[in-house]
Regions:
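Bacterial N-terminal signal peptides that target proteins for export
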Residues: 1-10
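A detector of low-complexity, intrinsically disordered, Ser/Thr/Gly/Pro/Ala-rich segments
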Residues: 5-6, 88, 330-332
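Bacterial N-terminal signal peptides
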Residues: 9-18
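Sec/Tat signal peptide C-region and signal peptidase I cleavage site
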Residues: 20-24
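Alpha-helical, heptad-rich or low-complexity scaffold/stalk segments
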Residues: 25-145
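Contiguous beta-sheet cores, especially beta-hairpins with glycine/small-residue-rich turns
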Residues: 150-268, 273-345
């Protein structure tokens, strides 16, 4: 009975989402749209024709293929999986809430099917891979949370400071301008009881410039520009490395201590709004994964947040460095790009 009721409700939201084209941005071609759907769900584009791949996704999610044109079905899937529909949070949002409740962090770099399987293994010892994926997620949520998972509009102010760490290993020898650099949140970001971005939420930066070693023994350099934080919802939060973040780095004893080691240090490069960042020195030839940096939001952002119920409030309070609206930094000029520069001896 639970299975049939859950599938019926999910199919209703799916069909309503397909009729609401403003909730998603369509890709240029059916193949591109399908690649995007496959990547979110499986981590890579599928093989075969679009119709075959589309049918597989629907069967994996709902246990059956759905009616409608290719574009309607793909739009409905993108809304159901990533964007949400008519007040109903997306699968990505719900999965993040479940991960936060069980693991106290999200695993944004894993495909959705693996994320759900890992939660099942944590709770029940095995993944229920013989059942439709959407139903499996709803069952997980019914075990963790009383009532339905909802989301609300939340305003994230500019200049909120938070800790992040590098996921990727960065070396001036191998980096090239334009390379994507991944970081993750080290703490939960919440606004007045609404969970916006749990620990583990992904942050995207890019390599801006790379300079090879120069004359007179001057070291090679690599600089980064920070782009965005990807919260629970489908929106993006712009971030940068500004004065408030640099001040927080200096005030953090752990991070400040790293500045005195041979592995990692901080340098400041200019006035407010310009780059501050890392200096790789001594025997170190790279920025290793796990290197901590403070960043801050660069503009006011409207995003979706999870209204944390009283039974789960302790998960927010248990985070030693939980970020809240009270940690909003001072006003700074965010019209200039903030970045990180690394130098290699």
């Amino acid at each position: 009975m639970f299975f049939k009721r859950s599938i019926t409700v999910m199919l209703l939201f799916f069909l309503l989402g397909a009729a609401s084209p403003l909730l998603a941005q369509e890709a240029e071609t059916p193949s591109q749209a399908q690649d995007e759907i496959d990547s979110i769900l499986y981590g890579e584009a599928g093989v075969g024709g679009v119709i075959q791949r589309l049918g597989k996704v629907e069967s994996d999610l709902f246990g059956r293929e759905l009616p409608g044109s290719i574009s309607e079905r793909q739009l409905g899937l993108l809304n159901f999986i990533r964007n949400g529909t008519l007040g109903q949070p997306s699968m990505v949002f719900k999965t993040g809430v479940a991960e936060w409740a069980v693991l106290h962090e999200v695993r944004s770099d894993m495909p959705l099917n693996r994320r759900i399987s890992e939660i099942e293994r944590q709770l029940e010892g095995a993944a229920g891979e013989d059942r439709p994926l959407a139903m499996r997620l709803e069952r997980i949520l019914s075990l963790l949370i009383t009532g339905q998972v909802t989301w609300q509009d939340v305003r994230v102010p500019a200049n909120m400071v938070f800790r992040a760490s590098f996921i990727d290993r960065i070396s001036p020898k191998s980096a090239a301008a334009g390379d994507v650099v991944r970081l993750k949140m080290e703490d939960h970001l919440s606004i007045e009881g609404y969970l916006v971005a749990p620990r583990g939420s992904r942050i995207i930066a890019r390599v801006d410039k790379v300079k090879p070693p120069r004359s007179f023994g001057r070291p090679s350099e690599i600089s980064f520009v920070f782009d965005r934080l990807e919260p629970l919802g489908p929106e993006e939060i712009p971030v940068f490395l500004g004065d408030a973040a640099v001040l927080a780095s200096k005030s953090d004893k752990t991070v400040a201590a790293a500045a005195g080691t041979s592995a990692l240090g901080f340098i400041l490069l200019g006035p407010i709004g310009l780059a501050g960042g890392f200096l790789v020195k001594g025997d170190a030839q790279e920025i290793p994964p796990g290197s901590v940096i403070y960043l801050e939001t660069s503009a006011l952002s409207n995003v979706k947040g999870y209204p944390v119920p009283p039974s789960l409030k302790g998960l927010l309070e248990s985070s030693e460095y939980n970020v809240s609206e009270d940690s909003e930094g001072t006003e700074t000029d965010t019209n200039q790009e903030g970045g990180v520069q690394s130098e290699q001896d």
